[in-house]
UniProtKB/Swiss-Prot annotation:
Belongs to the PTH2 family. Pfam families: PTH2. The keyword Cytoplasm applies. Keywords: Cytoplasm, Hydrolase. GO terms for cellular component: cytosol. It is found in: Cytoplasm. This is Peptidyl-tRNA hydrolase. It comes from Thermococcus onnurineus (strain NA1).
Length: 118
């Protein structure tokens, strides 16, 4: 049973290729995990040792990512907002993904529980 999880939220409106989406999600997962390891080491250790549960969901647009980020931060959940370098499919600086946690599952669900899986 998982008590901690990490959720990556990808923008639907960008219509990223599967490969591009995978890379953006990976950037988010690593960046946020390192942030949590530093800011909430007890959460990181628990998440890491129970199998590192990750979920990928979708948001409508950039505005929704910022709303989710603000909600997560109000609850004390570290986040990572990912901006693309713009070398392939989209313009430089485009915000593609928000990573939430890893954090206690019940907290993360308050932020992302209503979003649909990719």
């Amino acid at each position: 049973m998982f008590r901690y999880k990490q959720v990556m939220v990808i923008r639907k409106d960008l219509k990223l290729s599967k490969g591009k989406m995978a890379v953006q999600v990976a950037h988010g997962a690593v960046t946020a995990a390192l942030k949590v390891q530093k800011e909430k080491p007890e959460w990181f250790k628990a998440w890491f040792h129970e199998g590192q549960k990750k979920v990928v969901v979708k948001a409508e647009n950039e505005r929704e990512l910022f709303e989710l980020k603000a909600h997560a931060e109000k609850l004390g959940i570290p986040t990572a907002l990912i901006r693309d370098a713009g070398l392939t499919e989209i313009p430089p600086g485009t915000i593609t993904c928000l990573a939430v946690g890893p954090a206690p599952e019940e907290l993360v669900d308050k932020v992302t529980g209503h979003l649909k899986l990719v």
